[in-house]
Amino acid sequence: MLKRGVYAASLSVLNKDLTLNVEATISHAENLIKNGLHGCFFFGSTGMSQLISKNEKMELISKISTHKQRKHFYLGTGCNSLNENIELIKYASEFNFNTILLMPSAYYVGNSDEGVFEFYKKIILACPKIKIVIYNFQKLSGYILSLIHISEPTRRRTI
C-alpha cells in the first residue's frame, strides 16, 4: 500500500519502431527513485499506457517484479477494455503488485456514475485482493469523480 510521500508518473521510453523499451523505461523509473521520489507509477497517461501493448506491459511487470527498487514501483493498467484490465491486474497480482492505479474507461465521452461504478465493481469482484488508487483525470476520461460519488461505495467495498 502507498505510504505518505511524493509519487510521480513514470514515462515509457519507446524504441524507434514504437515498441516499449523495457530496460530504458525501468532505468528512468529507477532514476526517479534515486533522486528522491518515494515511488512511481508505470502505465498512466504520462507513460502512454493506451499505446503500449498488453504483452509489453506484461514483460515490464515481470522484469520490475525482481528489481532492487521493486517496493517503490506501482502499476496502472491504461486499458479501456474491462476484460483486459482484469487480465492485466490478475497478471500483476501474480507478482504481488496489489496496488493498482485505475481510471474509468477513457474511450467514451459522457460516462455515467452508474457505468463508472459498475466498471470498478466488476474489477473488484474479479480481483478482490487489490487496492485501487482511483485515477481522476477528467480531461482524459471525460468523467468527474467526486468524494460524494465514491465515499459510500468505498466504505462498503463495492468500489
Regions found by a protein language model. Give the residues of each.
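Active-site beta->alpha loop and helix N-cap motifs at the rims of alpha/beta catalytic domains
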Residues: 2-143
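Single conserved hydrophobic/aromatic residue that forms the stacking wall/gate
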Residues: 148-159
